[in-house]
Structure formats: C-alpha cells, structure tokens
Amino acid sequence: MLIQTSRFGEIEVEENQIITFPSGLVGFSEDRRFVIREDNAAAPFLWLQSVDNNGLAFVMIEPHVSVSNYELALTQEHLKKLDAKNIEELSVFVLVTMSKEMKDVTINLQGPLLFNLEKRLGLQFIIPDGKYSTRHLLFGDKLKDNNQEEPSSKTLEEQQ
C-alpha cells in the first residue's frame, strides 16, 4: 500500500512491515500502526512512522548506543502482550528528541519501545521506579568534557 507522509512523501509499505502497538504510544493512544524506516544517512537513528497519521513520525535509537548498562525488568504480562517467550526475542529502542546542537539531543530511557519484529507487535514500556530519565543526554557529557567538536554529519532536522 502507498501512504503519504509529511517527512518522506509517498512511501510504499507492505502489510508485513506494519508493526501494531495494541495500546498505542503514550500520548498517541489512537495511533497503533507504524512502520520502521531506515535512513543510511542518519544511522544509527531510525524512524518510526505512523501508517495512519501522515504527520506522526518519531526518531529512535538503540539505548545501548548511549547507556551500556541499560536494563529492563519485564514481567510475563509484558512478554505475553508481545507474544514473546523471553526478552531475547525482542528489540529495544528509545525515542529521541532532536536539537539544533548535537550535544543537546536527548533520549527517553524511561519509556522504551519494545518490538517483537517476527510477530510485528510493539509496546511502549514505562519504567516506574525513576531509575531512568525521559531526557537523558544521548552523548552524555562526551561532547562537553572532551572539548570535541560536534559530529560533522547533519542532524536529522537539517536533512529534511
């Protein structure tokens, strides 16, 4: 099927590419069908594009890019919602909030997105204990502390 998007224009999406979030995402409970879009120029970032809302797309990344010891404590209920037997069957991503300056880009570690890509199911899992932030700096203090220049690649905002 062809879908019209505000970010990518018209794109072809196969039914077997659609990931269903039965409960939607926090703040977007009505939007339940998404497709993951890769953009090699924006790696390691990925896009989560709504199939039904052409203006709704999120940037996401694997949490271990920023936090090596990121841990989830999933219950059997979470696994059941994703039709998974164990966490190894799942892919984990976190939402990214872009900024004009790379040093200010943040990720939401408190509300990761869990995917069972084989079953095409997704779930936003909210970590209740306050262990993680919704505004964790993606690069931590690496860019500030080492007086490194910001990466020369364009931000996702600039690529549009």
Can you say where each PLM-predicted feature lies in the sequence?
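Extended catalytic/binding region for NAD+/ADP-ribose chemistry, centered on the ART fold
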Residues: 69-74
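Short active-site loop/helix that positions an aromatic residue
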Residues: 76-86
